[in-house]
UniProtKB/Swiss-Prot annotation:
Pathway: Amino-acid biosynthesis; L-lysine biosynthesis via DAP pathway; (S)-tetrahydrodipicolinate from L-aspartate: step 4/4. The gene is dapB. (S)-2,3,4,5-tetrahydrodipicolinate binds at H150, G159, T160. The keyword Transcription does not apply. It comes from Xanthomonas axonopodis pv. citri (strain 306). It is found in: Cytoplasm. This is 4-hydroxy-tetrahydrodipicolinate reductase.
Length: 238
């Protein structure tokens, strides 16, 4: 680890993404995880040199350069408020936010640099751009978004599907959604444009959850030093 390592606070450290973030950050000499926040009081206060805190103790979190949040909607407001209070950037991949929480995000972007995204993979960033272009180039074509995930994923359509739908809608399409929950599928998204006698399919398949964690860590590094505002993943990784 270098003396100028970026100090990272990971919020939602007990989830699948949180665990991946902890593991990958430990392998990155440019990062130092100064705190890991979990929902309940942790059974161990320090794991592999990383201090663990309960969500109720968030206000006492150590100094950090950037926070990364992959938690649940009910835990989102406190980490957003902490970052705004301390003037620190936030990277969040928490899905299922309601309109009030989205409004809070927009308000916070007046004070801090932040990026909220349903998906931090490089491939999905490219897919989103392609969907925008296809929707604008194929007016009048039917647009369908099919998404598949593991059986434990609760929100449907997925946040990524909705993001792709927003990209399509912004270019004039009217997307419909189909969701599948089966087995241990990490994540698959197909955006299908259907015209008369022809069909275009744009597909992204994730086979390893590490791609999302790597993208979030990369975005966190790039967000430091940015002026206040709401950024897209593609603004930071492409």
């Amino acid at each position: 680890m270098t003396t100028s390592a970026v100090k990272v606070l990971i919020h939602g450290a007990s989830g699948r993404m949180g665990k991946a973030l902890l593991r990958l950050a430990a392998e990155d000499q440019t990062l130092q995880v100064v705190g890991a926040v979990v929902g309940r009081s942790p059974s161990q206060r320090v794991v592999d040199g990383v201090p663990f805190f309960a969500a109720s103790e968030l206000g006492g979190a150590p100094a950090f350069d950037v926070a990364i949040d992959f938690s649940l909607p009910q835990g989102f407001a406190p980490i957003l408020a902490l970052c705004a209070q301390r003037g620190k950037p936030l990277v969040s991949g928490t899905t299922g936010l309601d309109e009030a929480q989205r409004a809070a995000l927009r308000d916070a972007a007046q004070q801090i640099a932040l990026v909220w995204a349903s998906n931090f993979s490089l491939g999905v960033a490219v897919l989103t751009e392609l969907v925008e272009r296809a929707a604008g180039t194929l007016p009048g074509w039917d647009c369908d978004i099919l998404e598949s995930h593991h059986v434990h994923k609760q929100d449907a359509p997925s946040g990524t599907a909705l993001t792709l739908g927003e990209a399509a809608t912004g270019s004039g399409a009217q997307p419909r959604y189909v969701s599948l929950r089966a087995g241990d599928i990490v994540g698959e998204h197909t955006v299908q444009f259907t015209g008369l006698g022809e069909r275009v399919e744009l597909v992204h398949r994730a086979t390893n959850r590490d791609i999302f964690a790597r993208g979030a860590l990369h975005a966190a590094k790039r967000l430091i030093g940015k002026p206040a505002g709401s950024y897209r993943v593609r603004d930071l990784v492409l």
